[in-house]
């Protein structure tokens, strides 16, 4: 939000929890929304709300990474409790028997991709790999010069690297650790 404030933009903050409970009606007043975070853990209600918003002509600036990855739910009784059943992803551990299903809904956990809701279908890119290493900045690509999206790049030079500075997590650059990619097969 620092950049929005520095540029004197009026904005509202909507949390994942708000979106889960209130649905697409919460988004409908806005022409454009943006994810300024790491929206990795989204529930079906959140995905449905975003999909409905986009289908109604809303626009999304997806500024995060590794988004919309794990099947997630917010407990309808203990509303402060988020449940995630991780299996089938990067295999940082193996789920034990009986741990593939969410206890709050009975639905299969794991990856949204395995449930037919790949993030690539929603936002064009999705998580594909992770690993340590020196991060890198981004160079503008030809589509970034399309007049329809020129406002996104106001103040950024044609040859300027995006994220060409140290960061707090992986030492340097706008990209590192987790990698998203396009996949037209999904």
Predicted regions and their residues:
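Aromatic-Pro/Gly-enriched surface loop or interdomain linker
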Residues: 1-27
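A general structural signal for short secondary-structure junctions and capping/turn motifs
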Residues: 3, 24-25, 51-54, 174-176
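Generic structural hydrophobic/aromatic packing signal, biased to beta-strands
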Residues: 4, 11-13, 33, 63, ...
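Short loop/turn segments at secondary-structure transitions that flank enzyme active sites
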Residues: 10, 39, 66-69, 90, ...
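Short alpha-beta junction capping motif
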Residues: 27-70
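Long, C-terminal catalytic modules of enzymes
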Residues: 71, 75-186
């Amino acid at each position: 939000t620092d950049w929005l404030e520095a540029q004197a933009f009026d904005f509202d903050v909507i949390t994942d929890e708000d979106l889960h409970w209130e649905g697409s009606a919460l988004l409908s007043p806005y022409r454009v929304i943006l994810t300024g975070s790491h929206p990795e853990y989204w529930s079906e209600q959140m995905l449905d709300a975003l999909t409905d918003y986009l289908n109604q002509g809303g626009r999304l600036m997806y500024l995060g990474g590794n988004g919309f990855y794990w099947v997630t739910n917010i407990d309808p009784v203990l509303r402060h409790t988020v449940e995630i059943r991780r299996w089938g992803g990067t295999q940082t551990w193996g789920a034990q028997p009986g741990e593939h299903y969410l206890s709050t809904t009975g639905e299969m956990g794991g990856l949204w991709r395995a449930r037919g809701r790949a993030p690539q279908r929603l936002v064009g890119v999705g998580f594909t790999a992770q690993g340590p290493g020196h991060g890198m900045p981004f160079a503008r690509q030809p589509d970034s010069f399309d007049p329809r999206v020129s406002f996104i790049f106001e103040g950024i030079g044609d040859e300027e690297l995006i994220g060409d500075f140290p960061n707090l997590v992986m030492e340097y650059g706008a990209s590192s650790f987790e990698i998203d990619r396009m996949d037209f097969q999904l």
